[in-house]
Amino acid sequence: NTGGKAPRKHIAHKQAKKSSAAAATGGVKKPHRFRPGTVALREIRRFQKSTELLIRKLPFQRLVREIASEFKNDLRFQSSAVLALQEASEAYLVGLFEDTNLAAIHAKRVTIMP
């Protein structure tokens, strides 16, 4: 006995175990997944750079007409008026979510709730 470490024998066994597991599943590779929060942060950066409207135009227009019909029937809207309402609504909602997020961070929370 020379006092050196004995060669490790279980490494080859682990390799065989790994390859047999891959062969058993048919070698199907799992689809790539980002860590939780990564995609959310990427979307936040993307939407903060952009200036386009985030709510689809036609559903918003239907909502405006539905609300207006409660006050008066047969109202007509210029397309620019609906667009102005949508711009104002989205600006308000963005500001509301910013304030909500600050309040959540202040309360040491991550999730915002209604």
UniProtKB/Swiss-Prot annotation:
<keyword id="KW-0238">DNA-binding</keyword>
<comment type="subunit">
    <text>The nucleosome is a histone octamer containing two molecules each of H2A, H2B, H3 and H4 assembled in one H3-H4 heterotetramer and two H2A-H2B heterodimers. The octamer wraps approximately 147 bp of DNA.</text>
</comment>
<keyword id="KW-0544">Nucleosome core</keyword>
<dbReference type="GO" id="GO:0030527">
    <property type="term" value="F:structural constituent of chromatin"/>
</dbReference>
<dbReference type="GO" id="GO:0005634">
    <property type="term" value="C:nucleus"/>
</dbReference>
<dbReference type="GO" id="GO:0046982">
    <property type="term" value="F:protein heterodimerization activity"/>
</dbReference>
<feature type="compositionally biased region" description="Low complexity">
    <location>
        <begin position="18"/>
        <end position="28"/>
    </location>
</feature>
<dbReference type="GO" id="GO:0003677">
    <property type="term" value="F:DNA binding"/>
</dbReference>
<dbReference type="GO" id="GO:0000786">
    <property type="term" value="C:nucleosome"/>
</dbReference>
<keyword id="KW-0158">Chromosome</keyword>
<dbReference type="InterPro" id="IPR009072">
    <property type="entry name" value="Histone-fold"/>
</dbReference>
<dbReference type="Pfam" id="PF00125">
    <property type="entry name" value="Histone"/>
</dbReference>
<dbReference type="InterPro" id="IPR000164">
    <property type="entry name" value="Histone_H3/CENP-A"/>
</dbReference>
<keyword id="KW-0539">Nucleus</keyword>
<feature type="region of interest" description="Disordered">
    <location>
        <begin position="1"/>
        <end position="32"/>
    </location>
</feature>
<feature type="compositionally biased region" description="Basic residues">
    <location>
        <begin position="1"/>
        <end position="17"/>
    </location>
</feature>
<dbReference type="InterPro" id="IPR007125">
    <property type="entry name" value="Histone_H2A/H2B/H3"/>
</dbReference>
<comment type="similarity">
    <text>Belongs to the histone H3 family.</text>
</comment>
<protein>
    <recommendedName>
        <fullName>Histone H3-2</fullName>
    </recommendedName>
</protein>
<comment type="function">
    <text>Core component of nucleosome. Nucleosomes wrap and compact DNA into chromatin, limiting DNA accessibility to the cellular machineries which require DNA as a template. Histones thereby play a central role in transcription regulation, DNA repair, DNA replication and chromosomal stability. DNA accessibility is regulated via a complex set of post-translational modifications of histones, also called histone code, and nucleosome remodeling.</text>
</comment>
